[in-house]
A protein has these predicted regions:
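Glycine-rich, charge-decorated loop segments at or immediately adjacent to ligand/cofactor-binding or catalytic sites
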Residues: 107-112, 202-225
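Conserved anion/nucleotide-ligand pocket segment
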Residues: 225-297
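Glycine-rich, aromatic-lined ligand/substrate-binding cores of catalytic
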Residues: 268-348
Length: 447
């Protein structure tokens, strides 16, 4: 049954207060149409609850009596935008004793690639350990000797009450739906550390903002291209929630499985658009400001391995792209002539305030996704790179290791550099995606 039918049949019963037959006749035609769309939007919106909401509602709590660590960032909020860290800190039935932050930090303020050091949160009265600094993986002392590790560190009050260790780890971060987004790597590293130290981990599930049906891009070739932007052999667009990924990693990829519990979503299905969940979009990182960014990211992140600007240093990162030597109109016309599904390109000029081509006027385009269901980000970016090479063969360059690491394979870049046909490579990728789809099936939680 289509989602629209399923939702429309239930919630609206009887007349709408204040809009009887007589008053309805007095409402203008366009007002009736507008109201109709508003009502349709209301009934099509699901009542999705996250794993964080489930944890707070559980009575008794599964964390009762434990000293708890929390891996989180600004996306760790309830449906009502309350900080999960603050809510957990206020609990009396268990004790939140430490926070652990991925790339960009617990506070989400650090730029991409910037290392984050140890910090102290004076409001929560808790240590903030960085998992994107000297280490990507929680060390033994971070988990089992907290007081001994941090006491006397700058910024910590002399009277601070510090726990010795954690008895449980909680992971609550909104992913962006792409293998190259480092939070997936952090999840794997945290699970690995918890398994090594006998610490159970609870993963609080959140929706995949790109949905759970479509997969794209190569399945990463391991171990050759394993890194934090490709921690396990999964596709670039994996179509899984963090809870499902945790189950897959635990069953198939980790050398030592963790004591894993996933607190699932309620009300979410694989075909549900993020905008239909009723959940607020909180920036997962400084350069992921909107859902539009997340949609184009699985492909556009590949531009980090080229001399094209991927739009960092603008208010539309990954949607904008270009270079000082590109003529925006020429490139845009050539891209639109490809008639790629679900996307239109608009001529754009921009001057990045940081990152590649900082302070230089760049010609290029902005990606406008017109049909998210048909849009394929990875294929679009590969066609984009083919077009740039055809128009500017002496200007486009690739940073080999970076591009291959992001792509998860070294087989695609040489084809782009030489102008060869991508069709055989894309066909091979489709075959790998079918195999991965079969691999992931036992670990999926939602229809």
């Amino acid at each position: 049954m289509p989602h629209s039918e399923a939702f429309i049949r239930g919630p609206i019963r009887g007349p709408i207060r204040g809009l009887g037959p007589r008053s309805w006749g007095r409402v203008g035609r366009w007002s009736r149409i507008a109201l109709g769309w508003c009502l349709l939007a209301t009934v099509l919106q699901a009542e999705v609850r996250t794993g964080a909401d489930a944890l707070l509602a559980a009575d008794p709590s599964p964390l009762r009596g434990r000293r708890v660590g929390l891996v989180t960032n600004p996306t760790g909020v309830t449906r009502d935008l309350e900080s999960l860290a603050l809510r957990l800190r206020q609990r009396k039935d268990f004790e939140l004793v430490a926070l652990y932050g991925p790339e960009h930090g617990v506070r989400g303020n650090a730029q991409a690639g910037d290392k984050v050091g140890f910090q102290w949160d004076p409001v929560l009265g808790l240590p903030l350990f960085s998992l994107y600094g000297k280490t990507f993986k929680p060390t033994g002392p971070m988990l089992t000797n907290i007081a001994g590790m941090v006491r006397g560190s700058p910024g910590i009050p002399t009277n601070a009450v510090l726990a010795e260790r954690i008895d449980a780890m909680v992971f609550d971060i909104q992913d962006a739906g792409s293998r190259a987004y480092t939070y997936v790597g952090t999840l794997s590293k945290v699970m690995e550390a918890c398994a090594e130290h006998g610490i159970p981990i609870w993963v609080l599930d959140r929706p995949n903002p790109l949905g759970g049906v479509v997969m794209e891009g190569p399945v990463l070739e391991a171990p050759e291209w394993v890194s934090l932007v490709g921690i396990q052999p999964i596709p670039m667009r994996h179509g899984m929630t963090v809870g499902e990924l945790a189950r897959l990693f635990n069953a198939r990829f980790l050398a030592r499985p963790a004591a894993l519990t996933v607190l699932p979503l309620t009300g979410w299905s694989r075909s549900l658009e993020f905008a239909q969940t009723g959940l607020p979009w909180v920036m997962p990182s400084p350069n992921m400001p909107t859902l539009d960014t997340a949609r184009v990211y699985p492909g556009q992140v590949l531009l980090e391995g080229t001399n094209l600007s991927e739009g960092r240093g603008t208010t539309r990162p990954f949607e904008l792209f270009g270079a000082p030597w590109i003529q925006g109109r020429e490139l845009t016309d050539a891209l639109n002539a490809l008639r790629l599904p679900g996307v239109v390109f608009r001529e754009a000029w921009f001057t990045p305030s940081f990152s590649k081509h900082r302070g230089e006027l760049c010609g290029g385009s902005q990606i406008h996704v017109t049909d998210a269901a048909r849009f394929r980000s990875v294929t679009t970016t590969l066609r984009l790179l083919q077009t740039v090479r055809r128009l500017y063969p002496d200007r486009l360059t690739f940073q080999g290791p970076t591009f291959d690491r992001l792509m998860g394979t070294a087989t695609v870049r040489p084809l782009l550099e030489s102008g060869a046909d991508l069709a055989p490579a894309l066909a091979r990728i489709e075959g790998d995606l079918k195999a991965f789809d079969a691999l992931r099936q036992p670990h999926l939680l939602y229809p």
